[in-house]
């Protein structure tokens, strides 16, 4: 059965971020994606200028009411949320999650708690971080913080892999069954590798791949693609190890393709066959 995912995050008309980054790779792995956009911008904000608007929170609810009105909400297998334009949007998204789970009790909520990257110029609206700590985290089935977001969610520093696993389990005690630490950064084993963790109450998997050097301008949307692909693989029945290994390889293929084409925006269309069938392989290690 094809899986249906309601993906609620940002949208850019030019380039790739949020749904504009994740939607196509998720479809390429065989999932139906229902993109619902929290913002519509001309381009992502790290260009330093952009046009567009943040959607009113009620818009999100209205769209989902429309899907419910044609009696299709029960076919939704998961809700994915990413970049929020406001904390109020978050409240509406949790209402949507409750509505989807009422229609399909098997449905999952995957929260990508985007809280900004100060060094990358990514900023979020006031109250969004607090929303994720107080409401998004306990409501989620799967949550995917980077290292900075993990520290905000668990409310203490995380300095190494062992502490990251323990921090992930602190989050699990509050709601989610699965935590993806989607970028270990300085808490990883190695400074010259890109490392991730996938943690449950009784399993922890670590994986690393080479960093792809883009100099000063790192592509945007890597985390959005990572979260979306992991959700698809898990819904399709992959084990934690299989899901982590495929996603790591697929994202690496996108990065390598983007670098080879000397582009700044992720080249998800050019890399599409390698997203489905990666040529590289990275092995996850059980901790």
From Swiss-Prot:
Alphabetized, the UniProt keywords read: ATP-binding, Kinase, Magnesium, Nucleotide-binding, Transferase
Q: Name one Pfam family in it.
A: Phos_pyr_kin
What Gene Ontology terms describe where this protein resides (cellular component)? cytosol
Gene3D superfamilies recorded: 3.40.1190.20
What cofactor is this protein dependent on? Answer: Mg(2+)
InterPro entries hit by this protein? PM/HMP-P_kinase-1, PyrdxlKinase, Pyridoxal_kinase_PdxY, Ribokinase-like
- Superkingdom of origin: Bacteria
* EC number(s) given by UniProt: 2.7.1.35
Enzyme class, broadest EC rank: transferase
Q: Name one GO molecular function term.
A: pyridoxal kinase activity
> What biological-process GO terms show up in the record?
pyridoxal 5'-phosphate salvage
Q: Pathway, per Swiss-Prot/TrEMBL?
A: Cofactor metabolism; pyridoxal 5'-phosphate salvage; pyridoxal 5'-phosphate from pyridoxal: step 1/1
- Which residues are listed as membrane-spanning? none
Positions binding ATP in this chain are: 112, 144, 149, 182, 209-212
Binding sites annotated in the UniProt record for substrate: 10, 45-46, 224
SUPFAM superfamilies named in the record? Ribokinase-like
> Which segments does the entry list as coiled coil?
none
Catalytic activity annotation: pyridoxal + ATP = pyridoxal 5'-phosphate + ADP + H(+)
Of which family is this protein a member?
Belongs to the pyridoxine kinase family. PdxY subfamily.
Described by its record, this protein's role is as follows: Pyridoxal kinase involved in the salvage pathway of pyridoxal 5'-phosphate (PLP). Catalyzes the phosphorylation of pyridoxal to PLP.
Q: How does it assemble?
A: Homodimer.
Q: Per its record, how is this protein called by name?
A: Pyridoxal kinase PdxY
């Amino acid at each position: 059965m094809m899986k249906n995912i309601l993906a609620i995050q940002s949208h850019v008309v030019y380039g790739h971020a949020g749904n504009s980054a994740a939607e196509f790779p998720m479809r390429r792995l065989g999932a139906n994606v229902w993109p619902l956009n929290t913002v519509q911008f001309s381009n992502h904000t790290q260009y330093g200028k952009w046009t567009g608007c943040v959607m009113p929170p009620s818009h999100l609810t209205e769209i989902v009411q429309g899907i419910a009105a044609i009696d299709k909400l029960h076919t939704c297998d998961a809700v994915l949320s990413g970049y929020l334009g406001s904390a109020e949007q978050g409240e509406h998204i949790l209402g949507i999650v409750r509505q989807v789970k009422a229609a399909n009790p098997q449905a999952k909520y995957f929260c990508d708690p985007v809280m900004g990257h100060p060094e990358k110029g990514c900023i979020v609206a006031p109250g969004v971080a607090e929303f994720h700590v107080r409401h998004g985290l306990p409501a989620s089935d799967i949550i995917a913080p980077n290292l900075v977001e993990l520290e905000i969610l668990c409310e203490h520093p995380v300095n190494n892999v062992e502490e990251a696993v323990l921090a992930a389990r602190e989050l699990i005690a509050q709601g989610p069954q699965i935590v993806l630490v989607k970028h270990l950064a300085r808490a990883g084993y190695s400074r010259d590798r890109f490392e991730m963790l996938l943690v449950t109450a009784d399993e922890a998997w670590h994986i690393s791949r080479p960093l792809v050097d883009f100099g000063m301008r790192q592509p945007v949307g890597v985390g959005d693609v990572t979260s979306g692909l992991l959700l698809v693989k898990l819904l399709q029945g992959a084990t934690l190890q299989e899901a982590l290994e495929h996603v790591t390889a697929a994202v690496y293929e996108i990065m390598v393709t983007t670098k080879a084409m000397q582009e700044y925006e992720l080249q998800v269309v050019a890399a599409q066959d390698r997203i489905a069938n990666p040529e590289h392989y990275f092995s996850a290690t059980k901790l």
